[in-house]
């Protein structure tokens, strides 16, 4: 293992202590670094809805919480340098001192020592992004989970063709006129994941349409939505079907409740299509046999089982890992070329000690239209 400097014997980390409760442990172990992982000194973290939700519905006492992070690489696993994946895909090699960002599996029953809300986090070397020179740690910490989730949802579960690094360089979109006219619905375009999905769909050559509040419509259009629809309208589903001439085939549901599922199903054309949710959807909402319905758990990208309570107990999905690795290559280019616009954020103080309060606020729905970011290590800035 290559090290920047000697590592401390212990670290501070936000630990799950019970249902919906977390606390900072001042002296817990660092993650055990696996051969194909890098160890990151966490500079900044951000809060996702899943952080509080998972601590509520499937708490793992003693597990480190948190998904999104940015920071500096301080150690390389024993096989990182010999892995040719990044070189074969024209990605920068990972080196000690590199500025990076991404997401990990926090509150993991199978790995208590690893999560983003800590001073150090271990990350697969193939599933981490370099930060562009002009990007700050706070912004980078808000991107990882949404970028990974959208990639897996679109290119694995909705089966959207993934753009290659070459097609991005050539035209910034897939150069297929028919593909460019194909529409896809993003339900919840005002959310962080919805905003990311709109951008990625447009870059993949689609015409994204979205549901959102009137207050979020202008931003959705700015990001690339071809049209927006007020999800509160009683005719929202019918309006979507009319707008798409009864031909809509793809719907990504970033909200996932009975109301959102009903509108998506009404919007999909009479020939059916694919519906992908970002959570386990209510089975009573699956009302059309012509619609293939699936849901995404981004943690399957790591290639291991998810050992939460049902329905979140999932076997390992090797194909998800394959798609994720391919997507990280493409996404790195999108980030490098400034083609991804980050979601609005609010920088907060207090470090790890304040993260628990932010988790609760996001989980309770008290935060809207922005992500909360918390600097952790001032020496990284």
Swiss-Prot record:
<comment type="pathway">
    <text>Mycotoxin biosynthesis.</text>
</comment>
<protein>
    <recommendedName>
        <fullName>Trans-enoyl reductase iliB</fullName>
        <ecNumber>1.-.-.-</ecNumber>
    </recommendedName>
</protein>
<keyword id="KW-0521">NADP</keyword>
<dbReference type="GO" id="GO:0016651">
    <property type="term" value="F:oxidoreductase activity, acting on NAD(P)H"/>
</dbReference>
<comment type="function">
    <text>Trans-enoyl reductase; part of the gene cluster that mediates the biosynthesis of ilicicolin H, a 4-hydroxy-2-pyridonealkaloid that has potent and broad antifungal activities by inhibiting the mitochondrial respiration chain. IliB collaborates with the hybrid PKS-NRPS synthetase iliA to assemble the backbone of ilicicolin H. The PKS portion of iliA and trans-acting enoyl reductase iliB work together to construct an octaketide, and two methyl groups are introduced by the MT domain of iliA during the chain assembly.</text>
</comment>
<comment type="subunit">
    <text>Monomer.</text>
</comment>
<dbReference type="InterPro" id="IPR036291">
    <property type="entry name" value="NAD(P)-bd_dom_sf"/>
</dbReference>
<feature type="binding site">
    <location>
        <begin position="298"/>
        <end position="302"/>
    </location>
    <ligand>
        <name>substrate</name>
    </ligand>
</feature>
<dbReference type="Pfam" id="PF08240">
    <property type="entry name" value="ADH_N"/>
</dbReference>
<dbReference type="InterPro" id="IPR013154">
    <property type="entry name" value="ADH-like_N"/>
</dbReference>
<keyword id="KW-0547">Nucleotide-binding</keyword>
<feature type="binding site">
    <location>
        <begin position="213"/>
        <end position="216"/>
    </location>
    <ligand>
        <name>NADP(+)</name>
    </ligand>
</feature>
<dbReference type="Pfam" id="PF00107">
    <property type="entry name" value="ADH_zinc_N"/>
</dbReference>
<dbReference type="GO" id="GO:0000166">
    <property type="term" value="F:nucleotide binding"/>
</dbReference>
<feature type="binding site">
    <location>
        <position position="231"/>
    </location>
    <ligand>
        <name>NADP(+)</name>
    </ligand>
</feature>
<dbReference type="InterPro" id="IPR020843">
    <property type="entry name" value="PKS_ER"/>
</dbReference>
<dbReference type="InterPro" id="IPR011032">
    <property type="entry name" value="GroES-like_sf"/>
</dbReference>
<dbReference type="InterPro" id="IPR047122">
    <property type="entry name" value="Trans-enoyl_RdTase-like"/>
</dbReference>
<keyword id="KW-0560">Oxidoreductase</keyword>
<feature type="binding site">
    <location>
        <begin position="367"/>
        <end position="368"/>
    </location>
    <ligand>
        <name>NADP(+)</name>
    </ligand>
</feature>
<dbReference type="GO" id="GO:0016218">
    <property type="term" value="F:polyketide synthase activity"/>
</dbReference>
<comment type="similarity">
    <text>Belongs to the zinc-containing alcohol dehydrogenase family.</text>
</comment>
<dbReference type="InterPro" id="IPR013149">
    <property type="entry name" value="ADH-like_C"/>
</dbReference>
<feature type="binding site">
    <location>
        <begin position="278"/>
        <end position="279"/>
    </location>
    <ligand>
        <name>NADP(+)</name>
    </ligand>
</feature>
<feature type="binding site">
    <location>
        <begin position="145"/>
        <end position="152"/>
    </location>
    <ligand>
        <name>substrate</name>
    </ligand>
</feature>
<feature type="binding site">
    <location>
        <begin position="50"/>
        <end position="53"/>
    </location>
    <ligand>
        <name>NADP(+)</name>
    </ligand>
</feature>
<dbReference type="GO" id="GO:0140781">
    <property type="term" value="P:ilicicolin H biosynthetic process"/>
</dbReference>
